[in-house]
Amino acid sequence: MKKNIFLFYCFLAMMAASLKAQEIRPMPADSAYGVVHISVCNLREEGKFTSGMSTQALLGMPVKVLQYNGWYEIQTPDDYIGWVHRMVITPMSKERYDEWNRAEKIVVTSHYGFAYEKPDESSQPVSDVVAGNRLKWEGSKGHFYQVSYPDGRKAYLSKSISQPEAEWRASLKQDVESIIETAYSMMGIPYLWAGTSSKGVDCSGLVRTVLFMHDIIIPRDASQQAYVGEHIDIAPDFSNVKRGDLVFFGRKATAERKEGISHVGIYLGNKQFIHALGDVHVSSMNPADQNYDEFNTKRLLFAVRFLPYINKEKGMNTTNKNPFYQ
């Protein structure tokens, strides 16, 4: 009997501890900032693994930490808010966060790779890395950069898949043709709902990821991307749409309701566009083409020209102009 009573009270104590852990609490001032310390972390709508994924954040990305309940509610540089597991970011004071932002970085420029314990690709991996990951630059050794993670881990990153951030920015091209070339480099990467990395992308995540590889941040969702930059009502012959414009698809507007945006791609010219649906591939809006996409052609809405508006319009900027990176 006494044993049963003891077990009952143990159960109550565990339940109380569990409820306390789930209680949402504001973050203390000394840890209201943070930096992602895994290659790709998943943001969810709620603080639990069964909740839907809403977007992703990348290694080295600075974030604001808003609340805590065993998970962290964070805000990313594109102002997206979601919940991440406590094991994927390093909370920081404003002072440490500023130090991280000021430090020289190494940027991963290849779609995928690994960082190693030693300057030797046959040594133990420390983690995987993807394009756009940023790590603190600690030095160089042969064909490797010595780097450190936000959580203090040390590693070596091959110079063949990475570049010092300042050098990368100086050599970076942000013109239409360079951006389209990057989009083509992602051909065949699988579709992943809420994905924004080389591991997998959704339609707006493809746009977001391609541009981030050119140091450009734009709104996360297609429904947000559709209303920045210059709106273009597409001519029947597509003569007013340029390579690099974004083309949007969805439910057409009626007298009773506004259009509904549900898909986006990057226009390539000649009625061709690259997009993520199943995987990243090129489709056509010309019925005579072998890759004709009847489904999306019938729900084509309009185009947006965005490149001339980077750093000139709210929500579209390079990282050196984004307040999260300052």
Question: Locations of the language-model features?
Answer:
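Bacterial Sec-dependent N-terminal signal peptides
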Residues: 1-27
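Soluble non-cytosolic domains of exported or imported proteins
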Residues: 51-54, 123-126, 173-177, 197-202
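...with weaker cross-activation on analogous glycine-rich loops/strands in unrelated enzymes
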Residues: 218-282, 288
